[in-house]
Regions:
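Divalent metal-binding segments
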Residues: 1-131, 137, 142, 155-191, ...
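Distinct, well-ordered alpha-helical segments
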Residues: 119-124, 146-148, 196-207, 227
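Non-cysteine beta-strand/loop elements that form the S-adenosyl-L-methionine
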Residues: 149-162, 231-243
Length: 273
C-alpha cells in the first residue's frame, strides 16, 4: 500500500529507542508514523517527514518549525499532524453503532484541544444521527460558551501539563479563575512530581471549586498527599498501570519512589476522593 501506516502504544520498555532511521530500515517505501504511549511523541520515517513537510508549507513558520526533526521524533504536535494527515473524516457512524451494540449510551470526551469548532462538529454529528451517544465534552476554556442540549453537555476545562513546556503561571491562574467564575471545574493532567507541585501551587493561589481534580497523579510524594486533602482536590488514578507496566517501573523508577506511584489507599486514608 501507499497510504499512511499508523501505530500507537509504543514505549521504550517494549522496543527500545525508536527513530527515523529505524523506521527507514524496516519500512522505507511507505509513510509511517508511530505514537508513543504517553501521547506526546510521534516518530516518523523519512517518507512520512517529506509528506508532512510538503503539507506544512501553508502553515505559519513557527508551526512548520515544530514539524521539523532530524531524527523524526516530533513532540506535542498531535493536533497539527491530525490536520495535515487526515484526508477523510473518521468513521464516526460505524464507531458509534459498534459502541451502541455494546450498550454504550454515553461518552466522556476529555481531549484537551476540544474547542467551539469541535463542539459544533459533535452537534452536527448528533443531529445527523451519525453519533448516537450522549456526549460530555471537556476541553479548552472557550467551550464554556457552547449551547448545551440534553445530549451534549460541557465538562471540565482540561489542562494537559508537560514538564518541558509548563504554561505561564499567571495564565494558568487565569484559566482556573475564569473557569470557576462560570462554575466549571478544572481537570489537570499530572504524570510527574513537577507537574503536580506546579498544579497544587496554582490551586492554592487561585482557589478550588468542589469537583476540581488531578488526572493520573502518577507520582505523589508523601508531602503532597496532605496538600491534596487540604485543597479538597479529587484524584483519578490508574493503579492498573502498576500491574501492566510494573517491570518498566522497577527498571526506570528509583526503589525509594515505588510507593509514590498511582496511590490509592493512602489517598483514601487522607480523605482525598
Amino acid at each position: 500500500g501507499s497510504h499512511w501506516l499508523r501505530g500507537t502504544g509504543y514505549h521504550e520498555s517494549v522496543l527500545g529507542h525508536l527513530d527515523r532511521q529505524w523506521l527507514d530500515t524496516w519500512a522505507p517505501d511507505r509513510p509511517v508514523r508511530i505514537q508513543h504511549r504517553s501521547g506526546r511523541l510521534w516518530i516518523l520515517n523519512s517518507l512520512g517527514m517529506e509528506i508532512i513537510a510538503d503539507a506544512a508549507l501553508s502553515l505559519a513558520p513557527h508551526e512548520r518549525d515544530r514539524l521539523t526533526s532530524k531524527d523524526g521524533r516530533l513532540y506535542d504536535v498531535d493536533e497539527l499532524l491530525g490536520n495535515l494527515t487526515r484526508s477523510d473524516a473518521p468513521p464516526v457512524r460505524l464507531a458509534s453503532q459498534q459502541l451502541a451494540a455494546f450498550g454504550v449510551t454515553g461518552i466522556n470526551d476529555m481531549t484537551p484541544s476540544n474547542n467551539p469548532e469541535t463542539w459544533q462538529w459533535f452537534t452536527e454529528l448528533q443531529i445527523s444521527q451519525d453519533l448516537l451517544q450522549k456526549v460530555r465534552m471537556s476541553g479548552r476554556p472557550e467551550l464554556s460558551g457552547g449551547k448545551q442540549t440534553p445530549r451534549l453537555s460541557i465538562g471540565e476545562t482540561k489542562v494537559h501539563l508537560h514538564d518541558s513546556s509548563l504554561p505561564n503561571f499567571d495564565d494558568f491562574l487565569s484559566t482556573i479563575t475564569e473557569s470557576h467564575k462560570k462554575q466549571r471545574n478544572i481537570a489537570v493532567h499530572c504524570v510527574t512530581e513537577v507537574a503536580l507541585v506546579y498544579t497544587l501551587s496554582a490551586f492554592r493561589t487561585a482557589g478550588t471549586l468542589h469537583g476540581d481534580r488531578i488526572e493520573h497523579a502518577s507520582v505523589i510524594p508523601p508531602a503532597l498527599i496532605e496538600q491534596l486533602s487540604e485543597l479538597g482536590l479529587s484524584v483519578v488514578t490508574q493503579p492498573n498501570f502498576v500491574h501492566e507496566r510494573g517491570d518498566a517501573y522497577l527498571k526506570d523508577i528509583p526503589a525509594d519512589e515505588h510507593t509514590f506511584l498511582y496511590r490509592t489507599d493512602s489517598l483514601i486514608r487522607a480523605g482525598v476522593p
